[in-house]
Amino acid sequence: MTHQGRCYCGAVRYEISSAPVFNAQCHCRECQYISGGSPNVCLGIPEQGFRYTAGKPKTYRRTDLDNPVSREFCGGCGTHLLTRAPAAPGIVILKRGTLDDPAAFGNPQLAIFTCDQQPFHHIPEGVMSFERAPGKP
């Protein structure tokens, strides 16, 4: 089964054809900056199961960090579409709100970087929570 998504203005479109390897909320400060304050609700999709079908996103990578992530976004409307992280090679971290059907994959299965969680962030009942990423000190 395939799922489609796009940026807000529709200039950049994509398709996913692989099942997610994770379904999460990320509460790290970096994601809060990108989202405007909310946790990042995301899916980890194998790279081979993701492709852009229209448009070409712009990429941003902070130069002042060691091993920074790459963030891909629409140059027209600014919608953040996905992240590529050195710590997760072969995976694109897709922003669920950009899917045509954001509810297609149900509730997140885990919440990560809860050490940065804000008092107004909500983690659904029963979701596994980690102060950092699973397996990281």
Model feature map: region roles:
Residues 1-137:
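A short Gly-Trp-Pro
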